[in-house]
Amino acid sequence: MTSFFDSESPSNVAEYSVSELSGSIKRTIEQTFEHVRVRGEISGYRGPHSSGHAYFTLKDDRARIDAVVWKGTFARLKFRPEEGMEVIATGRVTTFPGSSKYQVVIDALEPAGAGALMALIEERKRKLAAEGLFDAGRKRPLPFMPKVIGVVTSPTGAVIRDILHRIADRFPVHVLVWPVRVQGDGACEEIVAAIEGFNALQPGGPIARPDVLIVARGGGSLEDLWCFNDEAMVRAAAGSAIPLISAVGHETDWTLIDHAADQRAPTPTGAAEMAVPVKADLEAQLASLSARLKGAAVRQMDNRRQTLRSLARALPSLDQLLALPRRRFDEAAAGLGRGLQMNTANKRRSFERSAAHLRPDLLTARIVDRRQRVVDAVNRAERIVERQVHRGAARVASADASLRALPSRLIGQVHRASDRVSAMSRRADAAIAADLRRLKSAVAAQDRVLQSLSYRNVLQRGFALVRDAAGEPVKQAAAVHSGMALSVEFADGRVAAVAGEDGTPSQAPKKRPARAGEPTKQGSLF
């Protein structure tokens, strides 16, 4: 009986282990596909990693294959791989026996024709334009005369020499060069860092902040200029706070940074011409404008001088304008002085007449003090009026001098001088009237005081004043002796009398009793 698993006939097929078969497949594939060119679209792009390698997948509409670009190869690429880019990869196929996978190890990478790159550029252009990065409204004008220009380009080559030479020829200014790579691995990052670095400079800092930036590169193929189509660079150019000029390639070469920049120059030399004007042209324009301005000023001065002469001839003479104000001022000054003197003299005479009736032994000190105050007040009033008169005369003299010097302001100054004289006259009249009222009130008050203290008021109440032969009042009975001539003064006159012997009357006169409620006619001395 035969086993179910026994082979019915011996096999001629060789038997391999898994490792042997995987190794055989690896050798076969790598020998067969040692050098291949694969056309496909980049998908799942990852890289470069921290190791420097880049991983992605090449695909078409029916299949896909993994690919890897090692660090050394990636640094030699002319452009950076991007998601969705159609490329032609040159390399070799290798497998991994441990996982039964294969991939293409890429030695060279190039775009699959200009059409593929242009399609990618157009797609990116539409995306960035939709975000408003290319809007004309956000573009700023270039400064007319920048003091500092920042240049982002390679430090070697003809580009930087052309820019520096052109700026020196047209209008020499301070130039700051930020050296960068303009092609190959790391070029995009360096240019973005340069743009952001210039914008990070602070005004007034140790390094001058540029007034305008130039990002420049010479001509080249689409692959050579590819980094200037990078999205990060376009965003850096659009976000620059400093006006930026792009000068990449030749006039026919357009990159996305040209659309984001504030100005696009066809060549680096053209960028230098945009950045600075021609100094000689500015000097010529300045000289022409200066000559025109000087001529216009001379003509204007001649016209104004002629107009002034015509107006001066039409004005009346200075003496005619000043005659009436001078006469009014003289009359006012003369009348003011005379009136003040007359009023002062009248008040002084009135005061002296009033003072003549006053007893020198009553309130002498107060009267003298009041008189001195009145005299001081009169003197002050005279000085005030005199100063005002002199001040008015000085002002009129000043106005006269000003009118002679400035005939165009003659009429206004005459009116103001007349108003000031009138105001001074009114103030002087008011001051004199106030002083006279104050003096009159003072004299009336003193008169009332004298009247209230006069002994005649006592005589009116029935008392009598006894005087001796010398006319002095007799104040005590002991001062009277028999036979002494006396003068008794009553309210209505005086009576001569002779003192009799000392003694008391034998019978005192009887006093008529006063009726109840009847007021006595005899007042009290106190």
UniProtKB/Swiss-Prot annotation:
Residues 499-526 are annotated as: Disordered. One of its GO terms (biological process) is DNA catabolic process. It is found in: Cytoplasm. It comes from the Bacteria. Its EC number is 3.1.11.6. It catalyses: Exonucleolytic cleavage in either 5'- to 3'- or 3'- to 5'-direction to yield nucleoside 5'-phosphates. The keyword Nuclease applies. GO terms for cellular component: cytoplasm; exodeoxyribonuclease VII complex. InterPro entries: Exonuc_VII_L (IPR003753), Exonuc_VII_lsu_C (IPR020579), OB-fold_nuc-bd_dom (IPR025824). Its main location: cytoplasm. GO terms for molecular function: exodeoxyribonuclease VII activity; nucleic acid binding. CDD domains: ExoVII_LU_OBF. It holds the Pfam family Exonuc_VII_L. Bidirectionally degrades single-stranded DNA into large acid-insoluble oligonucleotides, which are then degraded further into small acid-soluble oligonucleotides. HAMAP family: Exonuc_7_L (MF_00378). Heterooligomer composed of large and small subunits. Belongs to the XseA family. This is Exodeoxyribonuclease 7 large subunit. It comes from Sinorhizobium medicae (strain WSM419) (Ensifer medicae). The lineage of its organism: Bacteria, Pseudomonadati, Pseudomonadota, Alphaproteobacteria, Hyphomicrobiales.
